[in-house]
Amino acid sequence: MSSPEVGKKIIVTVPSTTANLGPGFDCLGAALDLYNEFIFTRIDGGRDRFDLIMESTDGNHLRGGPENLVFRAAQKVWESANIKPFALEARVKLAVPPARGLGSSATAIVAGLIGANAIMNSPLPKEKLLELAIDIEGHPDNVVPSLLGGLCLTARSSSQRWRIIRCDWHDSIKTVVAIPAIRLSTSEARRVMPKNVPISDAVTNMGALTLLLNGLKTGNDELIKEGMFDKLHEPYRWKLIKGGLEVKDAALQAGALGCAISGAGPSILALCKKDKGREVSQAMVKAWENSGVASRAPYLNVQTTGSQFRDISGK
């Protein structure tokens, strides 16, 4: 397959995600309507040339090289499709803050896969892109909803194949995500977790996951309250999030149905009914302020369409 013409341009829009949703450690995640935007352009240059220009919402510009996740994902597409690498520029508008537990790394991986694939007229099917995304990320709960949208449960079957289930999310259940002005890396958050957990904790999580999924499907308040409970990772990670437990308590007192660490943190997800959204948001921001942490708590919707791309060559 020949390289695309110089100047060909693809825009990819990728949603943020909230993963480890309640008891769904490393298997359950949902896409949210906060996006990173990537523009891929075929440029002149040698096959090892990859220009990455990132613009954050605060106007800062950064550059990245071949070690960047976008480039690594693009390489996976070229290898899988037996395509000779070519010079590529990726210009990124960042709205999803990094190291906040909102799947910023997943957006880079998914965008690199989709962009590199689309600019070659999509030789790889979406199923293959999902497989590559999970392989690069190491776990599925961010990249799968980021690519597909909605609430996704992903598990490895007895045949070692990944099985993905799109789960229902009732319209009455809304999300507030409190995003602090502090960072927490996934690697740091994983280091505090034990290698083994009691069987009773695993059983508790399995039961809670069943309750939560049924509650989200039906909009049943009580099932959500009882299901938003975790014993596998949150007990070990709360200590890494300054003021986190106080923020959780404030959200629940303001009427949230449940609260959880978003991804590896430090952002905190609250589930609530629509009429409680403003109160929950204000309570979470105030609680973090009392701990000396600046934050914002936007009211985000579950995004159901996943990542999108289109050809904008000549524009």
From Swiss-Prot:
InterPro entries: GHMP_kinase_C_dom, GHMP_kinase_C_sf, GHMP_kinase_N_dom, GHMP_knse_ATP-bd_CS, Homoserine_kinase, Ribosomal_Su5_D2-typ_SF, Ribsml_uS5_D2-typ_fold_subgr. Its main location: cytoplasm. Its EC number is 2.7.1.39. Catalyzes the ATP-dependent phosphorylation of L-homoserine to L-homoserine phosphate. ATP binds at residues 97-107. NCBIfam families: PRK01212.1-4, thrB. One of its GO terms (molecular function) is homoserine kinase activity. Pathway: Amino-acid biosynthesis; L-threonine biosynthesis; L-threonine from L-aspartate: step 4/5. This is Homoserine kinase. GO terms for cellular component: cytoplasm. Disulfide bonds: none annotated. It comes from the Bacteria. HAMAP family: Homoser_kinase. Keywords: Amino-acid biosynthesis, ATP-binding, Cytoplasm, Kinase, Nucleotide-binding, Threonine biosynthesis, Transferase. It is found in: Cytoplasm. It catalyses: L-homoserine + ATP = O-phospho-L-homoserine + ADP + H(+). Belongs to the GHMP kinase family. Homoserine kinase subfamily. The lineage of its organism: Bacteria, Bacillati, Cyanobacteriota, Cyanophyceae, Synechococcales. GO terms for biological process: threonine biosynthetic process.
